[in-house]
Amino acid sequence: MTDVVLRTHSLVKRFGGITATNNVSLEVTRGARHALIGPNGAGKTTLINQLTGVMPPTSGRVELLGEDITALAPHKRVALGLVRTFQINQLFNTLTPLQSLAVAVSSRHDAARRWWQPLGRDATIAAECEGLLEQFRLTEHADRATKELPYGKRRLLEIALAVALKPKVLLLDEPAAGVPAAERADILATVAALPADVSVLLIEHDMDLVFSFANRITVLVNGGVLTEGPPDAIAADPEVKAVYLGQTEPAHG
């Protein structure tokens, strides 16, 4: 039986008379590369905000590793292994990538409480930061101010910071948004290569990226789940073509 690491039960979010998410039940399995797609206004980011605790649901439940986390604050969900990135970068622009990673890694080791010691001085923390810089191809940019990095590198840094927190489930909200086309596939390939014990839930509008990345896809329309399945089944689904992809056959078949 496949392990479920993240599960929602009938999540509903209403804003007055508007239902943004409508009885959304979703399962993300261990090691999954799972994509959440849908047209603008489908409720994707609202759903992610409920998963991470930024926005409480009107009704329903969120479970992480079998534990009900519906009422937990965002930082407590992060501590349990539910980590996200944002559609708009959330970075320390005046710090270097090395310094930023030292902050993230140190916070996990509780070293940030030892404020009188330089961040990253600990050999274990320094080695982990160096490993992350190499993994995300940021080594040559390690000592540049983040605000000076090319945009694609800033995107990679944000994902590296999330990975530094040792997520069990990584939620990526359009990680390739604004990135030059030539660099988008590289970003998703880096994410796909994360260890198998890291489950990924991806929101992305670029269908070529989605179908090359995901082993399971959930389609959200008007706040509810239209369908879910493997990429081939989603690509062939006539309702998905009509509502989201249009009538043209996707290039990926």
Segments predicted by a language model, with ranges:
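Glycine-rich phosphate-binding loops of nucleotide-dependent enzymes
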Residues: 2-253
